[in-house]
Structure formats: structure tokens, C-alpha cells
């Protein structure tokens, strides 16, 4: 599996959040963490570029893998690529890189993926963060959690035996006009098998000590709003609401990097 690994040591300020450290040294507050950042549908590890750079500059280790069939791995797309494929992608990064005390972050569709990873290697994860993401229960699928119009479009694609589903324009994710051309040039069709698979979730994420949900309030999603209500009713979770569009890592990377450090 290909992935981006970043590792650097520095000190400073991210998004207005001060890190009290002498130049070239890390404070106890900024003790090194290991972040695994999982992108959402149609995206790739590329979308985390700025956030990863900011985390590195604070001395953290960052992995931003691209899931099978997407981004620079789009040549591997096929009808058999599904949520389980992507769960194994991330599990293998953790396994082959000998990672532990991982801060596992999943954006959007990535919430299904990191929930599955937590079923397999919860002992390797110290914090799990859902960034404007799906928060599945056992037997849920991406298709069932989609809007009626989107669900109908996916079902039609499945009936045609398509192997992928085209990405929406970047504007739909709330990306600023100046960044839309870049995002549009990088997004790739989502493997169709990721929509209908009913994955197994048996409470693995509940075993993780620190759990957080970040809601991008500028993105309309009844499903994500329901996740907010679910998290609010559970004292074991932290909830943060941001006034941004869906692609937070592109729209507000400074703010997100600081927030991830705080939630880690």
C-alpha cells in the first residue's frame, strides 16, 4: 500500500493556539503523537497535505494513506473494492509501520472505515476522531445513510453494473473558489462497492479512551446532524462544531490542525 509519511520536529503556533516551547523543543503539551488521517469518498491522501505539514511542524508523526481505487491508486479500482478493502488498507498501515497510541481521524466516508479499523486494532488506537463523518452502527451501509436522491443515483449505477460513481464538484464540499480547480483536478470516482456493503460494527470504537466528533455546520447533512445528537447523549464523547463547509482540511487547515492536537 502506498502512503505519505511525514515526520518533523518544530515549535510555534497553529491557528492561534500557542504551543509553549522553546525553539526546536517540544513541550509536554505538544508531546509527539502519531496521526493516521483517513480521507473521505472521492478524495485521497492529497487532501490532508496542509494539515499534515502543520502537524509535522509541531513534532508529530503523520500518515495520510490513500485508499485503494482512489487518488494515485485509482488504477486499482474494480468491482470488488469495498469498505472492507479500505478498512484493511488502514489496518495494514498500522500493522506494517508498527504503530501504537494512534490518533485515528476519519473524514466523511472515512468514518465507516475508521469504525471498522477500531473493530480490528482498538488496542493500537488511543484517540478516534470523526470529522464531519458517518458514525455507523452494526449493519449500516453508506447507501442507507445517503439522501433519497443520492441513494437513487447509486442504485441506478449499481443496476448498470458501474464500478464507480463520479465525484461532485468541489463547490458541493464548501471549498473556496480559489481552491476548487485544485480539488476538482484531484478527486476521482468512488468505488461502487463501498456504497452497499453492510459492514460489521460491534463496539470496537467504544473501547477507545478518547472519542470526538467534529461537525462542519456549513454542510447540510441530516445524517451528520443525527450523529451530533447521538454524541451529545453520550458523555464518553467530545463534540466540536465548526462554522465551515465539509472539506475542513482544505477550507480551514490551520484551525483543524490545532483542533486535532487538542483532541488527541
List PLM regions with ranges.
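C-terminal segment of N-terminal export signals and the immediately downstream linker at the start
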Residues: 20-38
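N-terminal export signals
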Residues: 7-26
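Catalytic active-site module of serine/aspartate enzymes centered on a nucleophile-bearing elbow/loop
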Residues: 240-264
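Flexible "cap/lid" loop of the alpha/beta hydrolase fold
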Residues: 130-161, 165
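Conserved loop-alpha-helix segment in the C-terminal half of the alpha/beta-hydrolase fold
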Residues: 217-243, 250
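Conserved hydrolase catalytic core segment
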Residues: 103-137
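Conserved HGGG/HGGXW glycine-rich cap/lid loop of the alpha/beta-hydrolase fold
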Residues: 33-72
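Active-site loop/oxyanion-hole signature of alpha/beta-hydrolase fold enzymes
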Residues: 67-102, 119-120, 145-146
Amino acid at each position: 500500500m502506498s502512503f505519505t509519511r511525514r515526520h518533523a520536529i518544530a515549535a510555534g503556533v497553529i491557528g492561534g493556539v500557542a504551543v509553549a516551547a522553546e525553539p526546536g523543543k517540544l513541550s509536554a503539551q505538544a508531546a509527539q503523537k502519531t496521526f493516521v488521517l483517513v480521507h473521505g469518498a472521492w478524495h485521497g491522501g492529497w487532501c490532508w497535505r496542509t494539515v499534515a505539514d502543520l502537524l509535522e511542524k509541531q513534532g508529530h508523526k503523520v500518515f495520510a494513506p490513500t485508499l485503494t481505487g482512489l487518488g494515485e491508486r485509482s488504477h486499482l479500482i474494480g468491482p470488488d473494492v469495498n469498505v472492507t478493502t479500505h478498512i484493511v488498507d488502514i489496518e495494514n498501515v498500522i500493522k506494517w509501520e508498527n504503530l501504537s497510541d494512534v490518533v485515528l481521524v476519519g473524514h466523511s466516508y472515512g468514518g465507516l472505515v475508521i469504525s471498522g479499523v477500531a473493530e480490528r486494532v482498538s488496542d493500537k488506537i488511543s484517540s478516534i476522531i470523526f470529522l464531519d463523518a458517518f458514525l455507523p452502527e452494526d449493519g449500516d451501509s453508506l447507501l442507507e445513510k445517503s439522501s433519497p436522491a443520492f441513494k437513487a443515483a447509486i442504485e441506478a449505477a449499481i443496476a448498470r453494473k458501474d464500478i464507480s460513481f463520479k465525484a461532485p464538484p468541489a463547490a458541493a464540499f464548501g471549498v473556496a473558489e480559489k481552491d476548487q480547480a485544485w480539488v476538482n483536478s484531484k478527486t476521482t470516482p468512488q468505488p461502487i462497492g463501498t456504497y452497499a456493503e453492510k459492514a460489521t460494527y460491534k463496539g470496537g470504537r467504544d473501547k477507545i479512551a478518547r472519542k470526538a466528533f467534529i461537525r462542519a455546520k456549513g454542510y447540510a447533512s441530516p445524517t451528520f446532524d443525527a450523529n451530533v445528537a447521538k454524541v451529545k447523549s453520550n458523555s464518553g464523547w467530545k463534540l466540536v462544531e465548526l462554522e465551515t463547509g465539509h472539506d475542513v482540511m482544505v477550507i480551514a487547515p490551520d484551525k483543524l490542525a490545532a483542533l486535532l492536537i487538542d483532541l488527541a
